Amino acid sequence: MKLTCVMIVAVLFLTAWTFVTADDSKNGLENHFWKARDEMKNREASKLDKKEACYAPGTFCGIKPGLCCSEFCLPGVCFGG
């Protein structure tokens, strides 16, 4: 009997916790779907599509050598064209 009561209280607590910590219903999955669909139609609206501009040859490329337009960075400077 005690175990049954403990289980019922635990289930009720976990159910209440789920509802309390859940996202607002205004931002439910259906809204995420429509937002993603709109971003697919309008590529400029997509945050994933935005890339940083590449660095011109002779520019300091620092610790991110992948940002050189030529993809070739030696001793911190972009080379090539």
UniProtKB/Swiss-Prot annotation:
UniProt-reported outcome of changing residue 63 to A: Loss of activity
Signal peptide: 1-22
Post-translational modification: The difference between delta-conotoxin PVIA and [deamido]-delta-conotoxin PVIA lies in the state of amidation of Gly-80.
Effect upon mutating residue 60 to A: Loss of biological activity. However, coinjection of this mutant protects against the wild-type conotoxin, suggesting that the mutant binds competitively to the wild-type conotoxin ligand site
Record note on what altering residue 64 to A does: No loss of activity
Keywords in alphabetical order: Amidation, Cleavage on pair of basic residues, Disulfide bond, Hydroxylation, Ion channel impairing toxin, Knottin, Neurotoxin, Secreted, Signal, Toxin, Voltage-gated sodium channel impairing toxin
PTM-bearing positions, type Glycine amide: 80
A Pfam family it matches: Conotoxin
Record flagged with keyword Ion transport: no
GO molecular function: sodium channel inhibitor activity; toxin activity
Gene Ontology CC annotations of this record: extracellular region
Tissue: Expressed by the venom duct.
Lineage top rank: taxon: Eukaryota
UniProt propeptide residues: 23-49
Annotated S-S bridges: 54-69, 61-73, 68-78
Modified residues (4-hydroxyproline): 57, 65
Annotated function: Delta-conotoxins bind to site 6 of voltage-gated sodium channels (Nav) and inhibit the inactivation process. This toxin shows weak effects on rNav1.2/SCN2A (EC(50)=2.9 uM), rNav1.4/SCN4A (EC(50)=5.2 uM), hNav1.7/SCN9A (EC(50)=1.9 uM) and rNav1.7/SCN9A (EC(50)=6.4 uM). In vivo, this toxin shows different effects. In mice, injection of this toxin causes hyperactivity, rapid running, limb extension, and death. In fish, the peptide elicites spurts of rapid swimming, with twisted motions, quivering fins and the lockjaw extended mouth syndrome.
Domain notes: The presence of a 'disulfide through disulfide knot' structurally defines this protein as a knottin. The cysteine framework is VI/VII (C-C-CC-C-C).
UniProt name for this protein: Delta-conotoxin PVIA
Species assigned in the record: Conus purpurascens (Purple cone)
